[in-house]
Swiss-Prot record:
Annotated catalysed reactions: S-sulfanyl-L-cysteinyl-[protein] + uridine(34) in tRNA + AH2 + ATP = 2-thiouridine(34) in tRNA + L-cysteinyl-[protein] + A + AMP + diphosphate + H(+)
EC number: 2.8.1.13
Protein name per UniProt: tRNA-specific 2-thiouridylase MnmA
Region (Interaction with tRNA): 165-167, 333-334
Length: 384
């Protein structure tokens, strides 16, 4: 075992998945004193066929046993409902499409969890996210861990080395204090390497499927879940010519760019998947809360689905201050390729982005996240 971090305590968020399991193993190999924490962030439906919390904890405990570390079960459900889920519902009721995983990272995993870890005497926390952190001196030199502790360098959030798994988009609201206490070991690896390591180590969850979907919804049908908290308010579905062609169940249950579940047909004629025409599929293009109208269009390339700019609010910048106006790249949704853009400052915590190439289905409530090459600068919530 490498002893270079001997005596330093790090608390790892063990989710039951393979990424956090390998994270814990790597840190122990580096000489850290590792403690595992399993976070329970959702209280209801533990007996539901869709809830995996109990199974995940069993998997996390089995991992801790193999690695030889302590594990603690901590309940953050109250904090989650207050700081994340309440905002999630408010956004949907306002007709927007929020990303609760971004808020969960900022408020729970890197705030409530971090605070708990510090009370345990930890110097650092770690998670299985595919991202990286580095500390840069005022003169631009990249500092190692020892130098970073002794300097007032600036911490940067970088994309994970595996482009297919990069999760910096979800972490863009982290600040300097949070990043200074955070380690992302698997961000330096490809997912295939993580799986290989897990198998070589003999971790019991080495072949476990990656989790998908919003953390508190799991694999259950999203509309069924949302309907438990938001009442349905049916209204007209209209096309771009103003013709009523159907009825929606409530604007909160739809998002821009949505194609499935509209209930208005739309034949998938061969060769018409992305173009217009009478047989092209329908997409949600606009939501009018004032008239409770859902506007839809045919064809992936319809002008109503294309945007050359956006306005964002509630900006959060990793460096603590907004970058200077200029040219960057941005994502307006997860897994989107970086798109060249120009940043312009707005009033207060607002900003504007313009794109030389049109962006598809830019969605209010989602996040616009800025990048300077591999460095994630931060971002804000899309307003329009």
């Amino acid at each position: 075992m490498n002893k270079r971090h001997s005596g330093q305590r790090v608390v790892v968020g063990l989710s039951g998945g393979v990424d956090s399991a390998v994270t814990a193993w790597l840190l122990k190999q580096q000489g850290y004193e590792v403690i595992g924490i399993f976070m329970k962030n959702w209280e209801d439906d533990d007996d539901s066929e869709y809830c995996s919390s109990n199974v995940d904890f069993i998997d996390a405990a089995a991992v801790a046993d193999v690695i030889g570390i302590e594990i603690e079960h901590v309940n953050f459900a109250a904090e989650y409902k207050d700081r994340v889920f309440a905002e999630f519902l408010r956004e949907y009721q306002a007709g927007r499409t929020p990303n609760p995983d971004i808020l969960c990272n900022a408020e729970i995993k890197f705030k409530a969890f971090l605070d708990h870890a510090l009370r345990l005497g930890a110097q650092k926390i770690a998670t299985g996210h595919y991202a990286r952190v580095r500390c840069v001196a005022a003169d631009g030199r990249v500092l190692d861990a020892a130098q970073a502790q002794m300097s007032d360098g600036r911490f940067e959030l970088l994309k994970g080395l595996d482009p297919s798994k990069d999760q910096s988009y979800f972490l863009h609201r982290l600040n300097q204090a949070q990043l200074s206490k955070t380690l992302f070991p698997v961000g330096e690896l490809l997912k295939t390497e993580v799986r290989r390591l897990a198998l070589e180590i003999g971790l019991p969850n080495a072949k476990k499927k990656d989790s998908t979907g919003i953390c508190f919804i799991g694999e259950r049908p999203f509309r069924d879940f949302l309907n438990r908290y938001i009442a349905r308010e049916p209204g007209p579905i209209k096309d771009d010519k103003g013709r009523t062609i159907g009825q929606h169940v409530g604007l909160s249950f739809y998002t821009l760019g949505q194609r499935q579940g509209l209930g208005i047909g739309g034949l998938k004629a061969k060769g018409a998947q992305r173009g217009g025409g009478e047989h092209a599929p329908w997409f949600v293009a606009r939501k009018d809360l004032a008239t409770n109208t859902l506007w839809v269009v045919q064809g992936h390339e319809h002008p109503w689905l294309q945007s050359h700019g956006l306005s964002a609010q509630d900006a959060s910048w990793v460096a603590g201050t907004a970058p200077q106006a200029g040219r960057f790249s941005a994502k307006t949704r997860y897994r989107q390729l970086d798109a060249p853009c120009t940043l312009a400052a707005g009033a207060g915590a607002a900003f504007h982005l313009s794109f030389p190439e049109p962006q598809w289905a830019v969605t209010p409530g989602q996040s616009a996240v800025l990048y300077d090459d591999e460095v994630c600068l931060g971002g804000g919530v899309i307003a329009a």
